[in-house]
């Protein structure tokens, strides 16, 4: 993506890393150099790729989405729990549903979970309550499955964990999801996403790592709890 043939402009607050071959602009509210103002100026430079540090308001979101309709690749971030709620969040910000449905191609959500320490790793059986909760959420049987956990050692400072790994949820728009967005139908959008063969929720990705012994069931439950606003006791 970052090649000499491509013109790449970023709008950030703040610019944290200097990147080669990329024109980076930092917004500054004190002099009214807002995301919207910088974006309008950036688009007049005919960029191939535009990175918006964050879509914080309706103006920024609308400019970014309209830029995507005119041949620019636009990348940005939103503060949401998962990929499903990201698309609807744009509409909640005041962007017209038809614009979101037309311009949005994909949403990638990500979280970090802790890795089980390999130096003190041991087998662990989840409680019946935890298994039922996960099975109901993910729709798959976990009976008889063994997980891993760390008992704590000097390598991990007795935490049982060492390092982190990313869990991801990629949502690529299809006709059913686009139709639900046009109707501003959150429930229909969620149902359409679940029918997409390529869609896997964050919790399922986290569970894959737990079943592979990379992370613990406790870390999976943390991810699930933030997605459902409830926990397991």
What positions do the PLM features span?
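Short, flexible helix-loop junctions that flank or precede catalytic/ligand sites
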Residues: 1-233
């Amino acid at each position: 993506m970052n090649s000499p043939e491509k013109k790449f402009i970023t709008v950030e607050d703040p610019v944290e890393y200097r990147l080669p071959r990329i024109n980076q602009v930092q917004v500054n509210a004190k002099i009214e150099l807002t995301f919207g103002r910088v974006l309008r100026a950036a688009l007049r430079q005919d960029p191939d790729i535009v990175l918006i540090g964050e879509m914080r308001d309706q103006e920024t979101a609308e400019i970014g989405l309209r830029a995507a309709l005119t041949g620019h690749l636009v990348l940005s971030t939103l503060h949401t729990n998962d990929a499903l709620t990201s698309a609807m969040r744009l509409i909640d910000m005041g962007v017209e549903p038809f614009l979101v449905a037309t311009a949005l191609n994909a949403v990638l959500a990500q979280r970090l979970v802790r890795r089980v320490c390999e130096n003190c790793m041991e087998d662990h059986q989840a409680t019946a309550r935890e298994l039922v909760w996960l099975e109901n959420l993910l729709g798959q049987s976990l009976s008889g499955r063994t997980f891993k956990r760390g008992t704590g050692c000097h390598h991990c400072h007795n935490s049982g964990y060492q390092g982190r790994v990313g869990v991801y949820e990629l949502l690529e728009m299809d006709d059913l999801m686009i139709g639900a967005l046009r109707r501003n139908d959150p429930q229909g959008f969620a149902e359409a996403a679940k029918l997409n063969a390529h869609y896997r929720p964050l919790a399922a990705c986290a569970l894959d790592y737990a079943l592979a012994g990379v992370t613990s069931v406790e870390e999976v439950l943390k991810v699930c709890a933030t997605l459902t606003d409830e926990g397991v006791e």
